[in-house]
């Protein structure tokens, strides 16, 4: 959030994606892993166009993977020049999520993540796409405004 020592949370979301054989959506838990943190660096869902074959694991189409990478540019401050996307003219992956851009556009970061079983100890039962709740960004904007007197 750019506010040291502060985290803004919201309700965990359901991951949407293919399940491994023998599992069904009602077996899955909510997204509570650390995959969202990787998105702040620009890897994972933000970089889907770098490896469109990932759709075989997380679901969707190659076109959607490319669109996710393009769309994330609308809510970030820049690009990471250390990780480039050949399919998009070697642009850097979108990096540094801007809470105000999320707030004004309504576009939520896209996250590639594992689907964990709802029962502890079972492990990964699929993979998919999830978005953090908008409430996280609303709270972050309010916290930022309070901190900086805006």
Which residues does each PLM region occupy?
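Anaerobic metallocofactor- and corrinoid-dependent redox/one-carbon enzyme cores
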Residues: 1-150
């Amino acid at each position: 959030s750019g506010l040291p020592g502060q985290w803004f949370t919201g309700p965990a979301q359901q991951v949407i994606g293919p399940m491994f054989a023998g599992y069904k959506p009602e077996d899955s838990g909510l997204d509570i892993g650390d995959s969202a943190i990787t998105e702040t660096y620009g890897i994972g869902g933000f970089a889907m166009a770098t490896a469109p074959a990932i759709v075989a694991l997380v679901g969707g189409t190659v076109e959607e993977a490319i669109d996710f990478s393009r769309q994330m540019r609308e809510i970030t401050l820049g690009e990471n020049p250390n990780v480039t996307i050949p399919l998009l003219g070697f642009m850097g992956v979108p990096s540094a999520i801007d809470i105000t851009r999320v707030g004004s556009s309504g576009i939520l970061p896209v996250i590639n993540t594992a689907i964990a079983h709802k029962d502890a100890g079972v492990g990964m039962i699929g993979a998919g796409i999830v978005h953090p709740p908008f409430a996280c960004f609303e709270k972050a904007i309010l916290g930022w405004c309070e901190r900086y007197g805006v």
